[in-house]
């Protein structure tokens, strides 16, 4: 709480800034304002530097008009998140630093990939095996740290939604699950980021829901009432989640159809990895699969498409990920986007219902 602590030096009444709910609101507004105010300048700079999106010529013909649209706008999202968290979160909380390490680490991987593609004009970007290698290094490192530093068995137990008191201990399997959740979610959001605003809105919705999970899990009264494990460190993740919401909404201002900027891998890989680590920390990995159902379906469509083509020589979809399939069926891009948003809203509500339905 850099800003809150600084303000209290001048006026004791500024202790009000130590309240979690107020800091959550301020975190949202700070990230939102950073994104909205810096966005136009960043877009102009990206245009000046000719950092534009390249478009596949075998995809929907309507996408050819997107060629040259500024990309790597994810830098704006990440900057807004990091600044907001540093200002309003309790920096003595190790969960905050674990989450920021994933934000920055996966952001760097995405940045290198984008830089190679759009600046050095290398269509392959960061070679896939190296991308997965560094994603794995970060994910396994974080998983091992969490396993070694656990202070409560509940921190590494599997919380099963809809069932009361079902929390099997995972042991070292916690490390394996954490790895797959972080890396899998990172790549799932990356695959979803193919239409204007398609990935950022589900990300904002899931982050907003996780803010509620983090708050209830980190509050001894709410956790007891809802019969979920009490993990006090998760309360500060509310600030991280609300920063994602604010930064995401600010970015959506420029990314909504027709997009003025794309987030690029620097944004999608980092946001996906961040949702993954937050799910792990609040012990809601299974609920992430529910709330992030759009990400799951997009990923499964790619896996099924590739598997079917290799095994049978036939494609299941006209094009994968599945949002392109609907475009090639004749759906206008805005229809695809909004319907996927609606599905995300429904799935997030189902996920939130697991808090009470046990």
From Swiss-Prot:
GO terms for biological process: cell division; cell wall organization; peptidoglycan biosynthetic process; regulation of cell shape. Pathway: Cell wall biogenesis; peptidoglycan biosynthesis. Its main location: membrane. It is an enzyme of class 2 (transferase). It comes from the Bacteria. This is Phospho-N-acetylmuramoyl-pentapeptide-transferase. The keyword Cell membrane applies. It catalyses: UDP-N-acetyl-alpha-D-muramoyl-L-alanyl-gamma-D-glutamyl-meso-2,6-diaminopimeloyl-D-alanyl-D-alanine + di-trans,octa-cis-undecaprenyl phosphate = di-trans,octa-cis-undecaprenyl diphospho-N-acetyl-alpha-D-muramoyl-L-alanyl-D-glutamyl-meso-2,6-diaminopimeloyl-D-alanyl-D-alanine + UMP. CDD domains: GT_MraY. Coiled coil: none annotated. It is found in: Cell inner membrane.
